[in-house]
Amino acid sequence: MAIRTFKCADTEAVFQLRRVARFANIERPALRKLKQLDLARSIEDLRAPPANRLEQLMGDRAGQWSLRVSDQFRICFRWTGSDAEEVEIVDYH
């Protein structure tokens, strides 16, 4: 029921309310999504709102899920039991 680990130090910094230059344009929506991820008790909790566009990933990211932050950025993570692990904000394109 919480974010257990971060895969990216910059993502953890955003979650801890620190400024990260490369995420300056998406700071607010990224923080909102990270907070939602931290509060989720099940993966199903992340299906709302629909704008999250929760997706189970395939290929080289098999086993991961993603939440849409913007057209360009996603929050990718692994879901284990009731926790998110290896959380990172990635430039998806």
For every predicted segment, state its role.
Residues 41-65:
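A short, surface-exposed loop/turn module that caps and links secondary-structure elements
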Residues 37:
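Conserved phosphate-interacting/catalytic interface
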Residues 4, 27-30, 46-50, 58, ...:
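Generic structural signal for well-ordered secondary structure
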Residues 2, 19, 42, 50-53, ...:
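Glycine-rich, flexible loop/turn motifs
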Residues 1-34:
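Arg/Lys-rich, positively charged N-terminal/basic patches that mediate binding to nucleic acids
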Residues 58, 65-93:
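Enriched for short, Lys/Arg-rich terminal
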